[in-house]
Amino acid sequence: PGALRGLVQALPEGASEARLACLHRLWDVGSNDRWWAARTALAELETPRMGYDHDAAAVKQWRKRLERAQESEERAWEELSHPTYFSHIARHDLSEFELGEFQAELARCTPIARAWLVRKNLREHPQRRAYLLFVELPGMDDEDRYELCRSLERTLGLPGPVLALWAGESPTLQEIRRSAFEPVFSR
């Protein structure tokens, strides 16, 4: 799947048919890239080009695919963010390099006292790398903690989606210590 995605991105501007063929193959392998494939195919089909006729059937097919892929992505996010945070988790799977980069990112975020990272095994996308990040943020009010967690979700360079949660009412610091393995970062 990664090679097909790279090929689609590397094909020249005029290679619309080849790009669409690769996107069909990417969709057919049932990969985690279906949402991307559908959006890219629709962008390709909806871009007016000299010498190409509008293919209404293909646009309709890719719109349906995009809708299915979006529903799948929503189910995956619901599963990741469901309050049974500690079910279907495993130790993080980051390489030493990835972990070092991640720890450097956390070190730049001064409010974080400690952090735990676990991999969440998603039933919707079992091959996808998805993570839960639990952070201890002493001395902050809940509104600021919430904003910081959303910011971490957008900016951290993890190889998959991440849901950031602070130690508090749910989950509690005790639950995190008991279930999230050892901290990956400590100040």
Mark where each language-model region is.
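A contiguous, surface-oriented mixed alpha/beta subdomain in the mid-to-C-terminal portion of proteins
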Residues: 3, 70-168
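Alpha-helical junction/boundary sensor with strong preference for TPR arrays
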Residues: 11-14, 29-34, 46-49
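Alpha-helical repeat scaffolds
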Residues: 17-28, 53-66
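Short, low-order "capping/linker" segments at domain edges
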Residues: 171-187
